[in-house]
Swiss-Prot record:
The keyword Ribonucleoprotein applies. This is Large ribosomal subunit protein bL21. GO terms for biological process: translation. GO terms for cellular component: cytoplasm; ribonucleoprotein complex; ribosome. The gene is rplU. Disulfide bonds: none annotated. GO terms for molecular function: rRNA binding; structural constituent of ribosome.
Amino acid sequence: MFAIIKTGGKQFRVFEGQEIYVEKLNVEPETTYQFQEVLAVGGSNPVLGTPFVKDAKVTAQVIKHDRAKKIIVFKYKKRKKYRCKQGHRQSYTKLLITKITV
């Protein structure tokens, strides 16, 4: 059985026992988190939501919060002596999907 959930402006296809990385959630590590915005549930009886599936929940265990690898943003204008270097690290939350209920 799988589900499609919406979090952080993105959609994820998740299975029970899967580890996923999502945008940072404001919850403590080692706690459980429930996703209420379930767009679809697949398996033997597939269900599509309009826009969400009623009474469907995906439960996940919060493993840790971390930051991604640094990326460099470099702006440059030729012949104008303009250079701007900036770094960015995106925060994320690592989750373990424990249960999908319809």
